């Protein structure tokens, strides 16, 4: 485990999809001082990007009070969307540079509300590259998919 600063929440999030669209899951690993919490969930029909956004939203929603947070994701869509693209989309009336509607606007709006409560640093790591905490988040996201598929088979 990497050395972590005291009194900062470390949030590792990942989304996964089997088929795109298809059954999807999200996973979150939270670390704060000596405490650790794991969260996951799934949706029967979704996209990978929707699950990436949902993972970040659910992780931030789980924090009871405003915090300093370091969010680590393997999704450039999530990291660049929240740090670079969102203000531009809003200025353009939720349109892309091609004048098309921004995909997943309701999720982006929800994420923005959650982000506003905290002081956040966003980090990107390459997926499936041996980053231990990101691998745990990936396992949790896949657990979310497995649970959705299991419920569907019953």
UniProtKB/Swiss-Prot annotation:
Reactions catalysed, semicolon-separated, are:
Endonucleolytic cleavage to 5'-phosphomonoester
Q: Give the co-factor note.
A: Binds 1 Mg(2+) ion per subunit. May bind a second metal ion at a regulatory site, or after substrate binding.
Cellular component aspect of the GO annotation: cytoplasm
* Residues reported in the UniProt entry to bind Mg(2+) 2: 14, 138
CDD domains attached to this UniProt entry = RNase_HI_prokaryote_like
Name the coenzymes or cofactors required: Mg(2+)
Per its record, how is this protein called by name?
Answer: Ribonuclease H
Name the Pfam families for this protein: RNase_H
Return one Gene Ontology term, BP aspect. DNA replication, removal of RNA primer
Task: Report the locations given in the UniProt record.
Answer: Cytoplasm
Q: Which cysteines are joined by disulfide bonds?
A: none
Q: Name one GO molecular function term.
A: magnesium ion binding
Entry EC no(s): 3.1.26.4
- Enzyme class name: hydrolase
**Principal cellular location given in the protein's record:** cytoplasm
Which species does the entry assign this protein to? Coxiella burnetii (strain Dugway 5J108-111)
Q: Which UniProt keywords apply?
A: Cytoplasm, Endonuclease, Hydrolase, Magnesium, Metal-binding, Nuclease
InterPro entries assigned to the protein according to its UniProt record, in alphabetical order:
RNase_H, RNaseH-like_sf, RNaseH_domain, RNaseH_sf, RNaseHI
Positions of Mg(2+) 1 binding? 14, 52, 74
Stretches assigned to the RNase H type-1 domain? 5-146
Q: What is the lineage of its organism?
A: Bacteria, Pseudomonadati, Pseudomonadota, Gammaproteobacteria, Legionellales
Assembly information from the UniProt record: Monomer.
- Describe the function of this protein: Endonuclease that specifically degrades the RNA of RNA-DNA hybrids.
* Family, similarity comment: Belongs to the RNase H family.
